[in-house]
């Protein structure tokens, strides 16, 4: 959630400095125009558990100065903003006002608006798969794909045989889908051993309980046996279906025949 801009705070007033040509001018005014404005943003994480206030100063579409409540002071983005940053950081009352904006501006507006907002939550879709289809006891990368969820605060953890893995984990971070949902990939670098069970656990505000998806490390022979069993089962179903079809078709044909000699 972002609030833009602050009113009536002078720092949030959008200043448009434009030199207009006189109405009696007969030629096009080629003098330069200048645009300077300030944005005030409130970033909320898990409600108001953590609030970040950002104030950005932009001149001709280039940010030159900002205040970040996580930093606690003004920082120059370009040399143009350095004099103002040094000046305002030397004035305790200005810094105190900016730091207090987390409560006086962000949390204040959140508490008012929260009563009228509908909380949108979308449950994530979780899948687990290896990046390589190679034999066990070789280096591999297990991927936990978490997609189409909202809001963006999510926790993804890897377990091996019930014990949490804390090393060898790589994440893409949050990726915006462009439709108000997010996705992320959390990968575990490991050397799978036969019989090991890897579990990806996902916690999200839309879920009452964590979602867990398992991946079992199996040898090539075990996988072949499983595939053979599945293939045999499917083949058996096909033969059963064909047999039932022939049986019911014959039954229907016999019921349609009437013995000769009946009186009507």
From Swiss-Prot:
Span list, region Beta-1: 32-121
Region: Beta-2, residue numbers: 122-215
Biological process according to GO: adaptive immune response; antigen processing and presentation of exogenous peptide antigen via MHC class II; peptide antigen assembly with MHC class II protein complex; positive regulation of immune response; positive regulation of T cell activation
Keywords: Adaptive immunity, Disulfide bond, Glycoprotein, Immunity, Membrane, MHC II, Signal, Transmembrane, Transmembrane helix
Domain spans labelled Ig-like C1-type: 124-214
Glycan attachment sites: 46
Chief site of localization: membrane
Pfam families: C1-set, MHC_II_beta
UniProt record similarity statement: Belongs to the MHC class II family.
Protein's UniProt name: H-2 class II histocompatibility antigen, E-D beta chain
Organism: Mus musculus (Mouse)
């Amino acid at each position: 959630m972002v609030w833009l801009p602050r009113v009536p705070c002078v720092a949030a007033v959008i200043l448009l400095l434009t030199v207009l040509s006189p109405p009696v001018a007969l030629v096009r005014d080629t003098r330069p125009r200048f645009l300077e404005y300030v944005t005030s943003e409130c970033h909320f994480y898990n409600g108001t558990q953590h609030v970040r206030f950002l104030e950005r100063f932009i001149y001709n579409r280039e940010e030159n100065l900002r205040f970040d409540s996580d930093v606690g002071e003004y920082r120059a983005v370009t040399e143009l903003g350095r004099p103002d940053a040094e000046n305002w950081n030397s004035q305790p009352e200005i810094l105190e006002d900016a730091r207090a904006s987390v409560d006086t501006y962000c949390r204040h507006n959140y508490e008012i608006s929260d009563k009228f907002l509908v909380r949108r939550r979308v449950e994530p879709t979780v899948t687990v798969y290896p990046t390589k289809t190679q034999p066990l006891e070789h280096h591999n990368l297990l991927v936990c794909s978490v997609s189409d969820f909202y809001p963006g605060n999510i926790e993804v953890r890897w377990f091996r045989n019930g014990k949490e893995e804390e090393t060898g984990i790589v994440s893409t971070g949050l990726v915006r889908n462009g439709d108000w949902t997010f996705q992320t990939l959390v990968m575990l670098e490991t050397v799978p051993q036969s019989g090991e069970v890897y579990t990806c656990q996902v916690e999200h505000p839309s879920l009452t309980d964590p979602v867990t998806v398992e991946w079992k490390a199996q040898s090539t022979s075990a996988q072949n046996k499983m595939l053979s069993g599945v293939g045999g089962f499917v083949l058996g179903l096909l033969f059963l279906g064909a047999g039932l079809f022939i049986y019911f078709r014959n039954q229907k044909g016999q019921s349609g025949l009437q013995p000769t000699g009946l009186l009507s």
